[in-house]
UniProtKB/Swiss-Prot annotation:
It comes from the Eukaryota. The modification ADP-ribosylarginine is found at R58. Belongs to the intermediate filament family. One of its GO terms (biological process) is intermediate filament organization. Muscle-specific type III intermediate filament essential for proper muscular structure and function. Plays a crucial role in maintaining the structure of sarcomeres, inter-connecting the Z-disks and forming the myofibrils, linking them not only to the sarcolemmal cytoskeleton, but also to the nucleus and mitochondria, thus providing strength for the muscle fiber during activity. In adult striated muscle they form a fibrous network connecting myofibrils to each other and to the plasma membrane from the periphery of the Z-line structures. Residues 267-414 are annotated as: Interaction with NEB. It is found in: Cytoplasm, Myofibril, Sarcomere, Z line; Cytoplasm; Cell membrane, Sarcolemma; Nucleus. One of its GO terms (molecular function) is structural constituent of cytoskeleton. The modification Phosphothreonine is found at T17, T76. PROSITE patterns: IF_ROD_1 (PS00226), IF_ROD_2 (PS51842). Residues 107-415 form the IF rod domain. This is Desmin. The gene is DES.
Amino acid sequence: MSQAYSSSQRVSSYRRTFGGAGGFPLGSPLGSPVFPRAGFGTKGSSSSVTSRVYQVSRTSGGAGGLGALRAGRLGTGRAPSYSAGELLDFSLADAVNQEFLTTRTNEKVELQELNDRFANYIEKVRFLEQQNAALAAEVNRLKGREPTRVAEIYEEELRELRRQVEVLTNQRARVDVERDNLLDDLQRLKAKLQEEIQLKEEAENNLAAFRADVDAATLARIDLERRIESLNEEIAFLKKVHEEEIRELQAQLQEQQVQVEMDMSKPDLTAALRDIRAQYETIAAKNISEAEEWYKSKVSDLTQAANKNNDALRQAKQEMMEYRHQIQSYTCEIDALKGTNDSLMRQMREMEDRFASEASGYQDNIARLEEEIRHLKDEMARHLREYQDLLNVKMALDVEIATYRKLLEGEESRINLPIQTYSALNFRETSPEQRGSEVHTKKTVMIKTIETRDGEVVSEATQQQHEVL
């Protein structure tokens, strides 16, 4: 690990632990820490003291560095110029000594606070080390497990699930075959149903034709009955006419007999009348016999036609009844087949839904197990990363502890130095050659303290510390 990385790691870890306030400025040497000045006040007071630290580093000649050192020691906003060999006033030296003592006192207080914070920091480091040990034990325990056994268990469960999926696939294939067979039976039954429907339509057409024939025969029978009635009426009329003619002839005969009796001289017409009567009776008997024969023949023909039509109608009715029975039986069979088909389709859908739900459940179990495996792997990787991070933090903390130990040792050695009092300051002149050779680096730290109360600035003080490197 390089020195730059150690420095940046120390600073970042310190800032994470103690925050940005306080501490050591970047770029300052280990032997010269700079502590912030904090104002002191009572708890609950509305006044506050703000400390600002300004750090300036520059390279100058010997005379310029000495002038800057003078300004830093005096702590004033301006640097008075003195000639060579000129001595400072004792009051100014006492003020400088008093300021130095105050600074040392404040540094002791701040160092005590820093020691307390450092003790808290050490306690936190111990706590982190305990957590690190616990996590290391957890990681070792996790490493000590048998991951192959878990993998074997998961593989066994996956094989069992795959076997169940194959069984369900075979069952589904068998159900598909049964469904295809049922569909074939359904198609065959549908074809048979179509044939039966066609036969039913043909029977209905034949029945309609028979009904037309029956209607025609009924109309013919009614026509014949009407004709028979008309013939009967005609026969009755002819009989009545014949009787009227006979009565007229008899009346004529009686009149002729009376005339014959009255006129004895006229020829005898009785024989002629008897002949005429005989002729008319013969003609009437002949007409009556012919009418009866014609009526009987027509009645017999109509009776035969009616019997024939009645036989056809009876046969048609019988066939219609048979067709109706067949249609009813076929309808019942079709309804039964439809019920069977519906039940089979319902069973098939239920089986498909059950198999689909079971397959989805198995897929969910597989996905869940894979997710658990992935989660365990991620958790193991996370524990390893946390362990590595804790190791890095531990190394950084060890480095910071060593650094703070060096800083504390340097601060203790600096505090134990005797306090120098300056009663007089001697200045010496340097030649340009010496000025050119006395080039060094001076570090200037400006501490500006602003006291505010209720948002208003009450007092403001500026302090400077110079250090020549």
